[in-house]
Amino acid sequence: AEPLAIRIGGINIADGSANFADFSLRPPFVTAIQSLNGDIGVLSNREQKAASVNIAGKVDQYAPVSIKGSLTPFDPLQSLDIATSFRQVELTTLTPYSGKFAGYRIRKGRLNLDLHYRIEQGRLNAENKVVLEQLQLGEKVDSPDAVDLPVRLAVALLKDSKGTISIELPVQGNLNDPEFSVMPIVWQTLRNLVVRAAQAPFKFIAGLVGGSNVDLSTVPFAAGSTEL
């Protein structure tokens, strides 16, 4: 028998709200999107036509968020084109994640995030643009999941003259492949970025001493000595 035909002429959202909580973290991560307004186009399981999406709201009452694009609602892997943007999100709210994965609390900072995800027949092409403004790390947190990298040094080196960190994280892959997962790719890219940033000063020093091929990613010296 054929599945039940479903057709919704459209959805309108007026002054709505959505809550998100991740209780796998200690402390838990909890946030809310308020003042949700917008609309979603025709939803039908009999038509392969994409439904339009245009929604806007505010994270924790003040940080604007928008979701725009289109998707096939009953088979999003067939076709999806969604752009999401977050502006001026307070970074301290992300401390549960920074504590677990970076090993530090966040003292202050703002996040601007632009995500553009496109899917055609299961093939993902994603662009993730992250801008961190005036990020300051707080006290160290003991976490078995934290990266074993000089995070404070990397943050300092990645900042430009205005104290801004800009990162682009493209992701591509086949979502029909059970071995493919987006987040491990994102975390590995971030890890590589931190490693390169932390090694940059030593490579710069190597260039000053004649551009030799000597590996200066670590520089040994005697305890108490002022000579390298």
Regions found by a protein language model. Give the residues of each.
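Broad hydrophobic/π-residue packing in well-ordered secondary structure
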Residues: F20, Y97, P220-A223
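Elongated, acidic membrane-bridging lipid-handling scaffolds
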Residues: A1-T93, V171-L175, M183-W187
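Amphipathic hydrophobic-ligand
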Residues: L25-D39, K58-K68, V89-L124, D148-L149, ...
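Extended terminal
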Residues: L4, T72-F74, Q78, T84-S85, ...
